[in-house]
A protein has these predicted regions:
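Alpha-helical structural signal
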Residues: 12, 93, 105, 134-137
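Short capping/connector residues at structural and topological boundaries
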Residues: 46, 51-53, 89, 109, ...
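Residues that form or flank phosphate/diphosphate-binding pockets in enzymes
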Residues: 10, 103, 127
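Structured adenosyl-cofactor binding patch, chiefly the S-adenosyl-L-methionine
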Residues: 109-149
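Active-site/ligand-binding-proximal alpha/beta "capping" segment
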Residues: 75-121
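Short amphipathic alpha-helical segments
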Residues: 14-15, 40-41, 86-88, 107-110, ...
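RNA substrate-binding interface of SAM-dependent RNA methyltransferases
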Residues: 1-80, 141-142
Length: 149
């Protein structure tokens, strides 16, 4: 999973824990974090980083690597045309959730093979980052488990 431009260390920690418990293979972060921020991330993740690789890289490197290795990129953003349950989230898929304020970057959207939308029916225009990650991660897990049965 890529957490595109996500800034808040506590949010990152919580989402890393969600990614790990949902069976993600790795977490990709395209932001620079200080030693102290990385400690905060580890604490908030309940040390889930012991069980899942957390890779700090650049947007350009991760997009190139994803394409070179045959990964489909599926981003969650409000411009999406369908829900995550209508998209195949199995196999080599990099799920992307964007930053707290700006969402998924244009570079990542341009490289995405699909953009899904999480439905909302309230007045607040977006979900908390942790909720968005949970919805995507659990739907991907659900689809993988369905394929096994």
């Amino acid at each position: 999973m890529l957490f595109d431009g996500v800034e808040y260390s506590t949010n990152l920690g919580f989402t890393i824990r969600t990614a790990e418990v949902s069976g993600a293979d790795a977490v990709l972060l395209n932001v620079v974090k200080t030693h102290e921020e990385r400690r905060t991330i580890r604490r908030a993740s309940m040390r889930a980083d012991r069980f899942i690789p957390v890779i700090y890289t650049t947007t350009e490197e991760l997009l190139a690597s994803a394409k070179e290795n045959g990964f489909r990129i599926v981003a969650a953003e409000d411009i999406g045309t369908h829900g995550p349950w209508d998209e195949d989230l199995t196999g080599n898929v990099m799920l992307v959730v964007g930053a707290e304020r700006h969402g998924v970057s244009q570079a990542v959207l341009d490289a995405s093979d699909a953009v899904v939308k999480l439905p909302m029916d309230g007045f607040v225009p977006s979900y908390n980052l942790q909720v968005a990650v949970s919805v995507l991660a659990v739907e991907a897990l659900h689809q993988r488990l369905d394929r096994r049965n």
